[in-house]
Amino acid sequence: MKTFELEGKGREIVARSADQKRALKAMRKNNEIPAVLYGGEKVTHFTVTKEAVRKLVYTPEIFVVELSIDGNKTMAIVKDMQFQPVTDEILHMDFLEVSKDKAVVMEVPVVLEGHAEGVKAGGKLSLQMRKLKVKAIYDQIPEKLTINVDHLGLGKTMQVGALHFEGLELMNAKNAVVCAVQLTRAARGAQAKG
């Protein structure tokens, strides 16, 4: 998995109040995003710039983030983000501290490879799940999960339960469909004639 370097400035957190709301609004107007780092010994509240997180957020790739908050370096993953519903602007980010002895759950992009038998017979290959949830130590999680579909016939599906990746535990439902070769009208017509 790729590493993304991100710098943040620590911030003091006060109990929920009008002063805190004003401070958060001022941060956002100043192109800063409030963030929190948890999962370690203590919870750390900090801010990052919008420009710094743009390449981290608006990409299909996944990263482990090397956070530098006031000089202290920590490895983390993006756990959650809150967006403004109308402008789609990032309002808040949550980071989970990771270590080599504790497994984390992440969504990893799925990539299909090969030419399915069902497609050769006139079907259409469709990807139902773009990402799969996996549980593993963060440095064992790949950038993408590659699934070979050469053996997938016409009208057949590939379910999560049929997949296995070394060192990863799949967290999705076993009967969830990852991809399928669907019958097209032309393929149905050919089957009816034949």
Curated annotation (Swiss-Prot):
<dbReference type="InterPro" id="IPR020930">
    <property type="entry name" value="Ribosomal_uL5_bac-type"/>
</dbReference>
<dbReference type="GO" id="GO:0006412">
    <property type="term" value="P:translation"/>
</dbReference>
<dbReference type="InterPro" id="IPR029751">
    <property type="entry name" value="Ribosomal_L25_dom"/>
</dbReference>
<dbReference type="Pfam" id="PF14693">
    <property type="entry name" value="Ribosomal_TL5_C"/>
</dbReference>
<dbReference type="GO" id="GO:0008097">
    <property type="term" value="F:5S rRNA binding"/>
</dbReference>
<dbReference type="InterPro" id="IPR020057">
    <property type="entry name" value="Ribosomal_bL25_b-dom"/>
</dbReference>
<dbReference type="InterPro" id="IPR037121">
    <property type="entry name" value="Ribosomal_bL25_C"/>
</dbReference>
<keyword id="KW-0689">Ribosomal protein</keyword>
<comment type="function">
    <text>This is one of the proteins that binds to the 5S RNA in the ribosome where it forms part of the central protuberance.</text>
</comment>
<comment type="similarity">
    <text>Belongs to the bacterial ribosomal protein bL25 family. CTC subfamily.</text>
</comment>
<keyword id="KW-0687">Ribonucleoprotein</keyword>
<keyword id="KW-0694">RNA-binding</keyword>
<dbReference type="GO" id="GO:0003735">
    <property type="term" value="F:structural constituent of ribosome"/>
</dbReference>
<dbReference type="InterPro" id="IPR001021">
    <property type="entry name" value="Ribosomal_bL25_long"/>
</dbReference>
<keyword id="KW-0699">rRNA-binding</keyword>
<dbReference type="InterPro" id="IPR020056">
    <property type="entry name" value="Rbsml_bL25/Gln-tRNA_synth_N"/>
</dbReference>
<comment type="subunit">
    <text>Part of the 50S ribosomal subunit; part of the 5S rRNA/L5/L18/L25 subcomplex. Contacts the 5S rRNA. Binds to the 5S rRNA independently of L5 and L18.</text>
</comment>
<dbReference type="InterPro" id="IPR011035">
    <property type="entry name" value="Ribosomal_bL25/Gln-tRNA_synth"/>
</dbReference>
<protein>
    <recommendedName>
        <fullName>Large ribosomal subunit protein bL25</fullName>
    </recommendedName>
</protein>
<dbReference type="Pfam" id="PF01386">
    <property type="entry name" value="Ribosomal_L25p"/>
</dbReference>
<dbReference type="GO" id="GO:0022625">
    <property type="term" value="C:cytosolic large ribosomal subunit"/>
</dbReference>
